[in-house]
Structure formats: C-alpha cells, structure tokens
Amino acid sequence: MDPTSKRPPPAASSSTTYPPLPKLEILNPSALPSHRFLRPAKRINEGPDVSHFLTSKAYRDIGVWILQLNHALVPRIIKKSTTVSTSEPTTDGQQQQQQQQQRQQKAEEVDEQQQPPPPPPTDALAAKLQLLRKKRDEQQPTTTEEIKTFPLPRYRDGEGVENQEESESIKKLQRLLKKVEAIIDEAPPDPGPRRFGNVSFRTWFKLLEERADGLLREYLPGGVLRWEQGAGGEKKEEEEGTETETETETEGDSDKKTNEQKQEVVGPLEELKAYFLGGFGSAQRLDYGTGHELSFIMFLGGLWKLGGFEGEENDEDGEVERRIVLGVVEPYLRVIRRLILTYTLEPAGSHGVWGLDDHSFVPYIFGSAQYTRPISSPNEPTPLEGSVPNAPKPSDITKPTAVERYRTENMYFSAIGFIYDVKKGPFWEHSPILFDVSGIKDGWGKINKGMIKMYNAEVLSKFPVVQHFPFGSLFQWEKDPEAGVPVQSVHMQNQPVASAAVTGGVGIPTERPSGPGGVTGTAAPWAQAPAQAPAAGIGAGAGMAPPMTAAPWARSTGAGAGAGVGASAANRFTPFKPAGGPGGAPHTGPPPPESFPSGTPGTASNQFAVTKAPWTK
C-alpha cells in the first residue's frame, strides 16, 4: 500500500474553526417575476474572447461548482464518544459479569436512597462494595475516531444503482440517464466502412434532441419545475418574438462588429436544455471531449442554482454534492463511455498522446479527492497532500489487476480502467501524462491539487475547448466585478484570432473552423501561428517540434511561475489558487525537448523527472 497512506499528515485540531467554503448560489424563487431566462448563446468566437471569459461570472461559477463537488468527496474523520474500561481486556463472559455487577450496584444505590442507613457492613460486604466502586471508576468515557470514505455505489449491469438510498431528485436524474442510454438501441451503428466516428451517432443525437423537452419535463427535480410554472410571462414573450439585449461588452471590445448581442427570452427548461444536449458530444463533428463534459457538469450546476437539490437532505457536510457526483456524474460517464464505444467518437480538443485523457477530465479530479487525506471539519480546506489510510498507491494505475480491483469503487481508477478497455500496449506509451502522475510520492492530495490546476490551464483556459460553451442567465458572460485582469502569456498570444464558424441551434457550430491555408479541421494547439514574436527562451521556426504538455504541477517553481493563462483571474477566488502559493493557472509552456523538466529533490517536479518516458533516457 501507499506509504503516505499509512502515516498521513496530522489533521487539523477539532477545535480549529474555519470560515464557510464558497458554494454556488441558489437563486431565490421570489425573484422569478424579474428574472429573465435566456437562450444560451455562443460568445467565445476567437482567442481574445478567452481573456474575457476568465473574468466572467460564468468562469467564477464554474470554479466554485467544481471545487464544491470536489470537497464533498474528501474522506471525513468521524469522532465518536464511547465508554471503555481502563482495565485489561476481558472475555465475553467477564463482560456479562461486569454488566450484571453494574446493574446490581445501581439497584443497591437506589435502595440506599429509599431506605434508612443500614448497619455498618461486615468486612466481606465492605470488600465487595469497594471492588464494585473500583470497577465503576475504571469505566471512563473516551473519544474514538473513525474514517469515513465515499466509494462508488455498487452497479448491476443494465440496472443502474443497486441497494442505494437516494433522494428523489437523484433518482429522477438516474432515470433520465437510463432513458438517454436506451436511445442507443434505437440507433444501431452503421456497419459500413468509416475513417472517423460512426454517422449513426447523428441519428442518435437527433432522437435525443426531439425528446429532450419531454424528458426534462418528466425527470427534472420538482424544485426546478416550479420555475417553469412561474415563467409564463417569459414564455409569452418568447412566442411573440420578444428579445432582450444583454449588457454592453467591455470597453476593450469596441473594435468588434457589435458591442451588444441579442438573446431570446425563453423558459428555464429551454436554457437548461442547451447545457444538457451539449453534454453528449457533437453530432456535426462526431466527437466528444472535455468541453462537452463541462457542459453536463454545468447542467447540474444549473439545477443546483434553481433549487433542484434543495430541502431534501441535511447538507451540513456536503451530502447532496456527494450524491450528485456518485449518483449522477458517474452514471453519466458510463453512458458516455458506451456512446464512445458504440459510435467510435473522436476526441474533441485533445492534445493527442500528450493530453491527460482523450475524452474526460473530471473523474481524475473527483477520483483523487476520494483518496485524499481525511479532514475533521466540514469547512476544513481540501488537503494539498497525503492520502487516506489503506489507499492504493498512485503507481497502481500501471497494474491492470489493481485497476480492475479499484475501478468499481473509485472514479480515478474507473477512468483508467476505460483506457485499458480501449487501448493496447505499454501504459507509459499511450498515456504518458498519467504515467508521470503515477510517480507522485506526496499522496493523492498532491494529485488532486495538481488536477485542479491542470483543469484550469488545459480546459478552462484553452480556446479549442471552451469556444462552444454557451452563456445565458444562469452562467453569465457579464464580467465579475471582483475579477482581475488576466495576464497575457504565450498561450494567450497564440490563441486563434479568426472568427469562428457560423453557429446555430444552441450555439453548436454548424461547420468546422478553417485552418491555415483554408484547410478545414481541428489543428493541434501548437500549430497556431503566433500573434507576435515568441518570448525569449521559447524556440521558434517552422521546424520546431511540437511541445510536450507535461502535468502543470511538474514544473519547477521560480520566476514566472503561475503566469499562465488566467493567472490573475484565478487569484480572485479560492478554487484555482493553491494555498500558500502564487496562485493562478500554471505556466504550461514546452519543456526542453531532450528531457522532462527536473526540479528540487523531494518535490513533485523532481519525481516527474524520475518517471519520465523510457525514450527520454
């Protein structure tokens, strides 16, 4: 087992008090008459728009929601008060005898209170009473600690969660996912030859679009439907073709074609539907990636905002959030994996072999949280290092037998197990970044911290990933008044500046953006022409090899650390800011081509140098 899991760092004292952790705001139903739901629209059309996104209210809400779910999965230390004997251990018979003596003693005490004082006891009786009082005094109250973890619920193939007590809202969402999965049987894959994804996925997606309204009305939690019932005025405006103008863009956007965008007023289900449908891939491109995964996560965030999970649980310690992740997010990932296998969906916005995973990211965040060092208070911050006792070692992901054992209880290993299902060959060869992460020696808390930083840098700060995320009234394009100005970095300078493809429907592009020379396709991130000369120390020229994207926390700290995309923006709230550090998204520029970066001995960056891929020796 992991050495760090046997001797985890000491948890904070139970007497320590912490301020409440940030949570995603739940909208007040009394604001319904004045709240206008908007049809989500595409706003990120070119690279510089990412800079605005990193200062928007939507970005703030995404960060808060991801960390709210993440913190709920961290193991807890449960304190229990018990009464134990300070004498030597006794057998069952001796324990029964002691209990009988205690009952006899209590009866004698009652008799003493009700009857006049007895005559002086004999020596034998006095000795017996003295022995009973001594044993009573040896029974002292004590506090024991129990570690509570949150594994995945047991699944039965084709039947969902087994023997799992869930709230009504979670059960409804599970039934919704079962209905979505059942549509696969109505759209079997096309048997003909193909180079990319199976065209039958478009048939499946069309069926989902046609049934989405009915499915959402039937299976969304009741707390959300009350907004739909009270949105009659907004629906009437929609039918009459009424439109509302959103706030004017920032002053820096004055050179764009228009400073204002018009968004159609709709009902709450119509706004939620955009994020729901966006969570199941692109029918046009026949692909699925982390941007689609983000859309579904924020669909759940929209349900949270509308009170879909409110009032059903005692949520003092993140119980509702845990049920959302374990009871909804994991079943959603299972549906997605079946879609990928059935229709051979292409990775969307992937770095290829140098990406963390072809299709997903959040299971690595939530799965590492499941094995993080336990906390003793609901508001104690997520540990940055250490592991729960008896957790598997991070290096166990390279052992198929260990992966098979843990994939049914942990989201990290479940995602690794899917990689083993679809890829062959040495693990270090097809998944080098995950292989590097397996060398971390500071426990699962260190991995969890790094995954969150990497998510901010490689998902939320990358144009190819976030360009299709739509903005409405639940997740607003409007600037967060507490946001700072994002730092311009090499990544920001290399963002594409050409206008994106024309969009339709819920903001999904109807055609691929044109690449260099008019070639249509999704170019690799490093293939973008730089907007200006590269910074000193960064190689240039047409013959430069594509850079390797190593895990962000594997960088050596020093001048310029944390100066990546959105560094300042991330500093404005706790979610993507490492405790005690400079904060912000890490610098993810290319390392020296001849080897992986090496850092100070005993640090994570040095550990990555030890676990570099074999061909770098």
Swiss-Prot record:
Chain residue ranges for the region called Disordered: 1-25, 84-169, 230-261, 376-398, 572-617
UniProt entry tagged with the keyword Transcription: no
Reactions listed under catalytic activity: [protein]-peptidylproline (omega=180) = [protein]-peptidylproline (omega=0)
Ranges of Acidic residues composition bias in the record: 239-252
First-listed, main subcellular location of the protein, grouped into a coarse class: cytoplasm
Keywords associated with the record: Cytoplasm, Isomerase, Nucleus, Rotamase
Localization of this protein: Cytoplasm; Nucleus
Biological processes per GO annotation: mitotic spindle organization
The EC number(s) this enzyme carries: 5.2.1.8
Domain of life of the organism encoding this protein: Eukaryota
GO molecular function: peptidyl-prolyl cis-trans isomerase activity; protein tyrosine phosphatase activator activity
Listed Polar residues bias regions: 84-93
Record's compositionally biased regions (Pro residues): 1-11
Record's keyword annotation contains Transmembrane helix: no
Role this protein plays: PPIases accelerate the folding of proteins. It catalyzes the cis-trans isomerization of proline imidic peptide bonds in oligopeptides. Acts as a regulatory subunit for PP2A-like phosphatases modulating their activity or substrate specificity, probably by inducing a conformational change in the catalytic subunit, a direct target of the PPIase. Can reactivate inactive phosphatase PP2A-phosphatase methylesterase complexes (PP2Ai) in presence of ATP and Mg(2+) by dissociating the inactive form from the complex.
UniProt protein name: Serine/threonine-protein phosphatase 2A activator 1
Underlying gene: rrd-1
